[in-house]
Swiss-Prot record:
Keyword Plastid: no
Protein family: Belongs to the RNase PH family.
Coiled coil: none
Gene name in the database record: RRP46
Localization, UniProt: Nucleus, Nucleolus
Name used for this protein in its record: Exosome complex exonuclease RRP46 homolog
Annotated organism of origin: Arabidopsis thaliana
Its biological purpose: Probable component of the exosome 3'->5' exoribonuclease complex, a complex that degrades inherently unstable mRNAs containing AU-rich elements (AREs) within their 3'-untranslated regions.
Main location: nucleus
Top-rank taxon: Eukaryota
Oligomer status and interactors: Probable component of the RNA exosome complex.
EC code: 3.1.13.-
Record's signal peptide: none
Modified sites of kind N-acetylmethionine: 1
């Protein structure tokens, strides 16, 4: 039985999406990404010469700096930085600019749920805007398990508080289907059935987890279509 949520959405329905790129002048690339009332800004600086200690100088290095809307960053934000860094390293070509560091700054504007996936989508758009060579794009989504056993996608803040478990899922998206012609893309392995990042919190059964993955992957079609439309519009304006 399909249940309607408090905001009127069906379980698998995403909130309205909005994305703008090249919105800041100082960074090499920038983007804002909104899902409903959740909004994040992402800025990319680099690549700059040199890598930090304990980084592989033979590859491109990425650092992620998370800036909350207010106050200092805590344990959760540090975890977000680590997840974002690993995700970015998975989708970017690390052999093109060896011994360099690219900084990705995430600024939270408003958090109304599904904050980390929103930040990942913003970072991906900003990396494209900066012209960073990428193996493929990433589309991120949050899938939650409610107390009644129903799964819902892209929860808002109120829904998050009522959930017993949730999964942050990041799927690869073929760059050829999204990026305009002439963009920096490297040939990579087939990624149609892959998953880049999977983070779970709370307790859910194996069956529920795989259902999350199935529903999440299905929902990325609309995210990918939105990416494609946004990038093509930006490309035509630039042309």
């Amino acid at each position: 039985m399909e249940i309607d949520r408090e905001d009127g959405r069906t379980p698998n329905q995403l909130r309205p999406l909005a994305c703008s790129r090249n919105i800041l002048h100082r960074p090499h690339g920038s983007a804002s990404w909104s899902q409903g009332d959740t909004k994040v800004l992402a800025a990319v600086y680099g690549p700059k010469a040199g890598t930090k200690k304990n980084e592989n100088a033979e590859k491109a290095c990425f650092e992620v700096i998370w800036k909350p809307k207010s106050g200092q960053i805590g344990k959760v934000e540090k975890e977000y930085e680590m997840i974002l860094k690993r995700t970015i390293q998975s989708i970017c070509v690390l052999t093109v600019n060896p011994n360099t560091t690219t900084s990705v700054i995430i600024q939270v504007v408003h958090d109304d749920g599904s904050l980390l996936p929103c930040a990942i989508n913003a970072a991906c758009a900003a990396l494209v805007d900066a012209g960073i060579p990428m193996k493929h794009l990433a589309v991120a989504i949050c899938c939650c398990l409610a107390e009644n056993g129903y799964l819902v996608l892209d929860p808002n803040k109120l829904e998050e508080k009522k959930m017993t478990a949730f999964a942050y899922l990041v799927f690869p998206n073929t760059t050829l289907s999204v990026l305009p012609e002439g963009s920096s893309v490297a040939e990579g392995e087939p990624v149609e059935h892959g998953i880049i990042t999977s983070i779970t919190h709370g307790v859910m059964s194996v069956d529920d987890y795989f259902l999350c993955v199935e529903n999440g992957r299905a929902a990325t079609a609309s995210l990918s279509a939105f990416f494609r439309k946004n990038f093509q519009q930006s490309s035509s304006k630039a042309g």
